[in-house]
Amino acid sequence: MAVIVAFVINSALNLLLGLLIAKMLGPADFGRFALATAGAVVLNTLLFEWLRLSATRFYSARVRDGEPWIRAGLDRAYGVIAVALVALAALCAGLGLAIDPSPESRLAITAATALTAVGIGLFDYHAALARARFVGGTYLKLVVWKNVFGLVLMAGTAWFFPQPVWVLLAGAAAQALAVVVMRAALHDRPGVFAPERSRQTLRLFAGYGLPLIAANAIYQLMPFINRGAIAAAADFSEAGYFALAADLGSRGFSTLGTALDLLLFQLAVRAEEHHGREAAEAQITRNIGVVVALLLPCAAGYWAVTPALQQLVVPEAFRGPFALYTALLIPGLFCLSIMNFALNPIFQIRRRTRPVIAAALLGCAINGIGLAVLPRLMGPAGIAVAQSLGLAAAAALLAGRALFGPDRLAMPWRDIGLSAAASLAMLVVLAPLRHLEPAVALTICVGLGVALYGAVVWVFDIAGLRLLVTERFGRRRPVAAE
């Protein structure tokens, strides 16, 4: 429960922080900031994500006590990569001071981007260690501290020094400070670094994580390339419009999806450990039903409340383009979430992850074709359509690999069909209400949408959610006295 609370807090505060920074920087500088942030995320994925995946999969409370050399090896690997990236940042900063000492220079922003990647990697790695040990309280505190430092440092920096490079550095500092504050709870007893054993383990970790990292890097490169394409085709203001819509949408989907994944994937891993591969794949089938049943209505509901959110929380300079880009990006964001949290676990359990890379490459290719064709037909909005088409193509390929062939998975078609029908019915009811007065529209759409979809879930027990709710919150029967 603490993990879910942490994700809710993180999502809400990230939304607030993104809006504050967008308002203080303005569309053009926010576009530069978003582009650099996307670059930092890509760097983090390429260099540090395998450590996070390995910690989540192979580190535990038992390993912490019985095999401390695993943590020692992971720490050393992070330290080596971080030092190299800091050295690169120092080189860029030094060249920037010699060539163009202004904070708007490309070298300055590149240096800040590298340091931001180090900060993101440091936080994500330690958060994964806390989750792997199932210490929810420690994880919750870590997230809270990160957001407190983020709000104070990043919002304060954007107010006093409204330039992307300083806000990026403030973000890196916020993530590092959260780890420093929680260092006692996250610390393990010193482990002996055993070179040969650690090398074997790191090879295992790399073999497990690299295919997933490659796919994630491709998916993160797509919006990075697309933001650059919009800036080149129009200007940085247009890139800022696109970035805000993409960032707010992706944060919502990824927060819910990641919270589900933390709970559901571990159930599949546990099923494999205790009952074998067949039981694990049966659990994956149930997980897919749950993920679709929760993400699909969220996608539909987000579209329904977009006009109200635009008027109530989006800075005035971004209004208009925000609603347009959001509507075009939602299908792609939904497809990406389905891949990450419903389809990828199939291949993770099987430890055959090449289809994940193939799907990502197809998505990138479709996105590239769209970039070449659609902007001439639709203007900058065509770039958002290209991104959604690329992600939809990737999801279709991955689903096809799961559904066909000798190892095809039995899909929960009943749950998927009922979720789709209920979401469509909800959209039909909410669509006429979208353009009411914003506060009224938001209140009615959220309340009515939850009530309608929740009623269908309850009546038909979609994905077993009714049973889960009654087991979790139902009244406990009194135990008879012996």
Predicted region positions:
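Membrane-proximal transmembrane or re-entrant/amphipathic helices at the cytosolic face
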Residues: 428-482
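Interhelical loop/hinge segments that connect adjacent transmembrane helices in multipass membrane
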Residues: 137, 164-166, 180-223, 263-282, ...
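Helix-loop junctions and terminal segments of transmembrane helices
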Residues: 48-65, 131-132, 245, 249-288, ...
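Signature of the first transmembrane helix
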Residues: 1-52, 89-92, 116, 151, ...
